[in-house]
Amino acid sequence: MKRTHHCGQLDKTLAGQQVQLKGWVQRRRDLGQVIFLDLRDRSGIVQVVCSPEVSEEALKAADRVRNEYLVAVSGIVVERNEQAVNDKLATGAIEVHVRELEILNVSKSLPFQIEADTDAAEDVRLKYRYLDLRRPDMQEAFAMRHKIMKSVRDFLDADGYLEIETPMLTKSTPEGARDYLVPSRVHHGQFYALPQSPQIFKQLLMVSGFEKYFQIVRCFRDEDLRADRQPEFTQIDIETSFLDTEDILAMTEAMMEKLLKETHGLELKRPFSRMTYEEAMNRYGSDKPDTRFGMELIELSDVLKDTEFKVFKGALEAGGIIKGLTLKGGADKLSRKDIDALADFVKPYGAKGLAWLKVDDEGIKGPIAKFFNEAQTAALLAAMDAEAGDLLFFGADKKQVVFHALGALRLKFGKEFQLIDENAFHFLWVTDFPLVEYDEQAKRFVALHHPFTRPKAEDLDLMETHPEQVRAEAYDLVLNGFELGGGSQRIYERELQEKMFKLLGFSSEAAKEEFGFLLEAFDYGTPPHGGIALGLDRIVMLLARKSNLREVIAFPKTASASDLLTEAPNKVSVEQLIDLNLSIISKRS
């Protein structure tokens, strides 16, 4: 039986026509002399009816059918009477009266129902991922993923970009997270690494004169996982010669504008908002701020410079800062127990505690109210735009501790008290990142993005004297508090790249050992170039309104980097280890 139509495509215009369908049985209802089947394929669901008036043989076959049996049916499209119309189905105005039914395959009892909403535990869904992916909302998410990838490819192709593949087996270099290593059978004791990104190769393609490159590429990072991270992920990788930062930002905005219009019918406002790294941290406590709601961090170091409260005073004397957060109407929203729990909430961010005050008609109340005189209270309330019923929170410590603690608290309040417009898409460029930051544990500077990021021209002289003050010609694209990706202008002169490696603690010998091939390439007329890499999985997650990346990756890993479906990673045979000249040793405690 050859399929003539898809289930979700049938409507009243086909009434009276014979159709042949194939799909899975979503639901079966046996009324004795009539059996109703909800037949599902990728396009949707249609009701098919098996009755003795149309076909005794089809009714007998339908009697053997159960949920998720795969069947082929042939029948006539019939318009339902008005009382029988199902408004919940796109095909609810019609049904198919079956003349012939063939069971193509059977199904065991299901571990969970194939429905849009499921209460199945995630580990069960991942173990039976092939069933989970049958659910309509999962099918829709992957249809959107395809649409996004096609939109990106079409846009970049029209703009003159070439899609060029780069190696999956490459050299391990010290440029970021831990590598996934692949042992070489031919070269005993040596290893390939799976790429964390095609960064070096795409720069070499610019040296090669391709000028405009892109790739939708798989990347691998052996790092701790969270809701928006996976060990293998896909990024939209773009590199171009002779374009400056403004050109790259404009190109990316145009691509996202096309993408949102095609997937959601939205017209984006361009140019996107911009904010420097310093401004983002000061206002939102984050380098990827969610700008769908206000509640900005308030600078209080000057207002409270004469404070006698030891915690505040000590922070200022140690070169730290004081910032505040106003929760409007919070006095009635949070109990003392709730407030105490917030002190525990901020501790993982380095905060030693969380000072707070309630505002009422008489002024301020709380454990630290006694440390404020009348003038200080007035100045504080004015600075924090506070009124009766508000709850005020304070962070006093090193800059980064205050930023991270209050930034996280701000997001927590935004979600808990429904301050965020969940239907909005707020794009934001964050620019002027520090080129490097000092790693206290490693006792050296590390690149904030990667070692190939170009310093701002006006800051070049600071690289040797005050490297922590050097800004990068780098930019991140943020959507609703998630970093979609980032990019930069790249270093393309050997001398400057060697200076960058030296700043990061590489000796001349180590730099040559790890990156000699790139340094040599820079001796052959390398053009100015820059680019951007955007996380495809994260884009799909946000546009499909999913809560984590596992919902938009067909076969994802768990939080422990395991695949519950295939049971990877797994042990390999002794013979395989011998081929690779490897042996397993226990890690020393």
From Swiss-Prot:
Give TM segment ranges. Answer: none
Q: Could you tell me which PROSITE patterns the record lists for this protein? A: AA_TRNA_LIGASE_II
Predominantly, its location class is cytoplasm
Q: What's this protein's name?
A: Aspartate--tRNA ligase
Q: Give the record's family classification.
A: Belongs to the class-II aminoacyl-tRNA synthetase family. Type 1 subfamily.
Residues engaged in binding ATP: 221-223, 230, 483, 535-538
For this protein, what reaction is catalysed? tRNA(Asp) + L-aspartate + ATP = L-aspartyl-tRNA(Asp) + AMP + diphosphate
List this protein's GO terms for biological process. Answer: aspartyl-tRNA aminoacylation
Protein's cellular compartments? Cytoplasm
Give the EC number(s) listed in the UniProt record.
6.1.1.12
Kindly give the InterPro entries that the UniProt entry links to this protein.
Aa-tRNA-synt_II, aa-tRNA-synth_II, aa-tRNA-synth_II/BPL/LPL, Asp-tRNA-ligase_1, Asp-tRNA-ligase_1_N, Asp/Asn-tRNA-synth_IIb, AspRS_core, GAD-like_sf
